Amino acid sequence: MIFKAVRVPFKSGRFAVILNEEDASELGVREGDRVRVRYGKAGVVATVQITREIVEKGFVGLTDLASMELGISDGAEVDVFPSPKPKSVELIKKKTRGEKLSQDEIRRIVEDITNNALSEVELTAFVISSMLRGMDFDEIEWLTRSMIETGERIEFDRGTVVDKHSIGGVPGNKISLLIVPTVAAAGLLIPKTASRAITSASGTADTMEVLANVNLSVDEIKEITERVGGVIAWGGATNIAPADDKIIRVEHPLSIDPRPQLLASVMAKKGSVGAKHVVIDIPVGEGAKIEKVEVGRSLANDFIELGRRLGLNVMAAITYGGQPVGRAIGPALEAREALKTMEDRRGPSSLVEKSLGIAGILFEMTGIATNGYQHARKIFESGKTLEKFREIVAAQGGDESVKAEDVAVGDKTYTLTSQVEGAVVSVNNKSIVKIARTAGAPKDKGAGVYVHKKRGEVVKVGDPLLTIYAEKEWKLDNAIEVANTERPIVVSGMVLEVYGRRGV
């Protein structure tokens, strides 16, 4: 059937069309069915949504993504007709039955994910079946290779390419802002593609964006990395492993991160940027994504094995994840803390030691130094880390002369103080993140939390425990309410209990 196209005013990460219910009935399609939309030589397969009022009879509503793909404007005539389900739907059913998929079958599923041929329900079924039925290492390897092959790739013309990745789960993990320039200052290439926050208060890309442009193309990532040694860019601005972003989109509402997808997601991105040596940061501790050391070790071994199959030299670091890294949580606060640490050549031990430790592992993996940690510390303390970071900021369109004091943070603040004397016995990662997000992070770059006291530190009555920063008064009020409810930092007296009789 021929329809007049009209763009509908909402964005969708998938191809979708909106049909009047009478037209849908005549086409013989129902809500959630597929149709092919053809405009000249261009075409897309889209999911049907049905309405009585939004779109008139004889018109078809197209989401922004579908409109851009077809290259059409309002009023253009398009041909719409039913489209069968892709073959990968049957392959997903096969996995739900617990059967092993072949390399070609996994490739077909990934291609359909990349091309937006699967509905949200079908993609979710694939993710859930992989979690419940599992994947063996052959399947995980094939999934990873398919993710790499269906996206953009970077091939560098010179140098040794390295990379690092943290599996997340710990607030304030701004270590990439120190690791990348430290490693680049040693002559290695480190094209760090980072993520934005999904459930955290700030992803590495959110933090770096305070100081420089992170929306870089693959060509820009290559050019800058070869020129100055490294970048910190948002992976979502590229077409690197595009299936991964679509998988993450359905995992997020369910708060799941199945191991097969986690392994494939990380290693596909590392393989796509040409990395030959990779360090995986696996934070372990109370309130982290992984709370038990043995689970962290198991995951580390899986990363190493998958790397071996892909021809990548992989090492994993089990790191402490029981409380935030550094003291600042939130994009601008973290950028300021990272900058000040580089300027002063000292800072929170959790931030400095973790950053130099992981940079040192990369130095030892590549033969740069036999004692990688000491080599990384020498670079950091010499000021070369800051010098290289400023080069990277300038190459990404930022102000090369920016100082920590120049970074603006939220001007609406509230400080939570201790009501008792004693020592901090716990810092709740999840509560800290909840407060920071309620205050507006990461969308409001200046919002977040600064932790004054961490586990083991002595506290007096009235001492500040944490300060909340916000850009809007009402968000600060909401964050204060959360802070007073959650007990993000717990202080206990040094005497916990008293036994026995008092007096005579």
Curated annotation (Swiss-Prot):
GO terms for biological process: AMP catabolic process; pyrimidine deoxyribonucleoside metabolic process; pyrimidine nucleobase metabolic process. The active site is at D257 (proton donor). InterPro entries: AMP_phosphorylase, Asp_de-COase-like_dom_sf, Glycosyl_Trfase_fam3, Glycosyl_Trfase_fam3_N_dom, Glycosyl_Trfase_fam3_N_dom_sf, Nuc_phospho_transferase, PYNP-like_C_sf, PYNP_C. Pfam families: Glycos_trans_3N, Glycos_transf_3, PYNP_C. Keywords: Glycosyltransferase, Transferase. AMP binds at G169, S195, R196, A197, I198, T199, S200, T204, S265, K289. GO terms for cellular component: cytosol. It comes from the Archaea. PROSITE patterns: THYMID_PHOSPHORYLASE. The keyword Ubl conjugation does not apply. It catalyses: AMP + phosphate = alpha-D-ribose 1,5-bisphosphate + adenine; CMP + phosphate = cytosine + alpha-D-ribose 1,5-bisphosphate; UMP + phosphate = alpha-D-ribose 1,5-bisphosphate + uracil. Its EC number is 2.4.2.57. GO terms for molecular function: 1,4-alpha-oligoglucan phosphorylase activity; AMP binding; pentosyltransferase activity. PANTHER family: THYMIDINE PHOSPHORYLASE. Belongs to the thymidine/pyrimidine-nucleoside phosphorylase family. Type 2 subfamily. Catalyzes the conversion of AMP and phosphate to adenine and ribose 1,5-bisphosphate (R15P). Exhibits phosphorylase activity toward CMP and UMP in addition to AMP. Functions in an archaeal AMP degradation pathway, together with R15P isomerase and RubisCO. NCBIfam families: AMP_phos (TIGR03327), ARCH_P_rylase (TIGR02645), PRK04350.1 (NF003338). This is AMP phosphorylase 1. It comes from Archaeoglobus fulgidus (strain ATCC 49558 / DSM 4304 / JCM 9628 / NBRC 100126 / VC-16). The lineage of its organism: Archaea, Methanobacteriati, Methanobacteriota, Archaeoglobi, Archaeoglobales.
